[in-house]
Regions:
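Central regulatory/effector-binding core of bacterial HTH transcription factors
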Residues: 1-63
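Short, well-ordered beta-strand segments
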Residues: 1-5, 55, 82, 106, ...
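Secondary-structure junction motif
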Residues: 12-13, 103-126
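Alpha-to-beta junction loops
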Residues: 46-57, 79, 145-154
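Beta-alpha-beta core module
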Residues: 65-72, 77, 140-189
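Extended ligand-binding regions for polar small-molecule ligands
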Residues: 98, 178-203
Length: 203
């Protein structure tokens, strides 16, 4: 049972599916949609294994600790920037930190992730012309807010389908965040087997 929402799309399973099935032919996936709210995120991640077994998304050690779940890393996703289609930078293929000068960049609040905090520290020190604004939770609302206000949003490429009027652009910086599967601290045999299979494939 794979939990899916706009921020946690099941794309990774689509990509890995042929190889997973090759090694674990009995595996069956059931997609379980859920609404991306702070309450749901807390509830679902703390109770993985009850209604939902795995979720694909970004994470770090602090988040796993806070949410009391495990994570298996599949890749490191580069931080990108989401902009409205009518934004002055939307026509560019790749951005540089210099491009962001004079812009307002929305980033998850300090302390949410050491990876975001490291990027924030560099931008604050080297590019004071970029205004950094905090927010508390990634969901469709924050994309709507940026589309309406012309603010920029720190994002990852797999969120491209979240908002049709927003474009996700790569940036020339070397900041990434772990992306993978979140699962229960005490997983069922099936989930344990899936995790081991995925680990074997992605090594």
């Amino acid at each position: 049972r794979v939990g899916i929402s706009p921020m946690t799309p099941p794309q990774v399973f689509v990509e890995l599916w042929p190889r997973i099935q090759e090694q674990y032919p009995k595996v069956k996936f059931k997609l379980v949609p859920f609404e991306n709210t702070p309450e749901n995120a807390r509830e679902i991640l703390a109770n993985l294994g009850q209604n939902i077994d795995v979720i694909a998304g970004i994470f770090d050690e602090a988040m796993l600790e806070l949410r009391k779940c495990n994570g298996v890393e599949l890749s490191r996703e580069p931080f990108c920037v989401a902009v409205a289609l009518h934004h002055r930078l939307a026509g560019k293929k790749v951005l540089t930190p210099e491009d962001l000068k004079g812009e307002r960049l929305l980033m998850m609040r300090k302390g949410w992730s050491c990876y975001v905090d490291a990027l924030r520290a560099e931008l604050t020190e080297k590019y004071p012309e970029i205004t950094i604004a905090d927010f508390d939770f990634y969901n469709v609302d924050i994309f709507n807010r940026c589309e309406n206000s012309n603010d920029m949003l720190l994002a990852i490429k797999s969120w491209e389908s979240v908002h049709p009027l927003m474009k996700i652009l790569p940036v020339e910086w070397d900041y990434k965040m772990p992306y993978g599967l979140l699962y229960a601290k005490d997983p069922s045999e099936k989930v344990e087997k899936l995790v081991r299979t995925v680990e074997g494939i992605t090594k």
